[in-house]
Amino acid sequence: MADITAELVSVERLLWTGKATMVTAETTEGEIGVLPGHEPMVGQLIDNGVVTIHPVDGERLVAAVQGGFLSVSENKITVLADWSIWASEVDEAQAQEDLKSERELTRSRGDAALRATRRLNS
C-alpha cells in the first residue's frame, strides 16, 4: 500500500510524525484529503478546524487545530498549526465551558475541540 510521510506540528509541540495512507484537513478552501502522490500545494487551515491522520499501522488520529498552514510536497505533508490538541486529550466538560467564554479565541478552541471529539467518535 502506498503511503505519505506526515507531520502534525503546533507552535508548542510536535504531535505526530510517521507514515500515513491519508491526511484530511479543513482549509479556507474547504476540506481536503491528501493521498500519496498528491500534487504539491500550500493551504491555510481554518481557525477552528479538524485534522485527521490515517496512519499506516494504527487507528486514525484526530486533532483540533487553530489556524496555521499545510504544505504538500512530493510524498510529504506537513501541517503546522498555531494550536492543536488530540481529540483523545480533550476534556469535554472544559470545552463546553470554553464555548461560554467572553474571549473569542477560547470559544473557537472549545468549538474545535468538541468537533474533533465528535469526529473521533463517529
From Swiss-Prot:
PANTHER family: ATP SYNTHASE DELTA/EPSILON CHAIN (PTHR13822), ATP SYNTHASE EPSILON CHAIN, CHLOROPLASTIC (PTHR13822:SF10). F-type ATPases have 2 components, CF(1) - the catalytic core - and CF(0) - the membrane proton channel. CF(1) has five subunits: alpha(3), beta(3), gamma(1), delta(1), epsilon(1). CF(0) has three main subunits: a, b and c. Disulfide bonds: none annotated. Pfam families: ATP-synt_DE_N. The gene is atpC. It comes from the Bacteria. This is ATP synthase epsilon chain. It is found in: Cell membrane. Residues 97-112 have a biased composition (Basic and acidic residues). Belongs to the ATPase epsilon chain family. InterPro entries: ATP_synth_F1_dsu/esu (IPR001469), ATP_synth_F1_dsu/esu_N (IPR020546), ATPsynth_dsu/esu_N (IPR036771). Produces ATP from ADP in the presence of a proton gradient across the membrane. It is a peripheral membrane protein. It comes from Corynebacterium aurimucosum (strain ATCC 700975 / DSM 44827 / CIP 107346 / CN-1) (Corynebacterium nigricans). Coiled coil: none annotated. GO terms for cellular component: plasma membrane; proton-transporting ATP synthase complex. Keywords: ATP synthesis, Cell membrane, CF(1), Hydrogen ion transport, Ion transport, Membrane, Transport. One of its GO terms (molecular function) is ATP binding. The keyword Transport applies. Residues 97-122 are annotated as: Disordered.
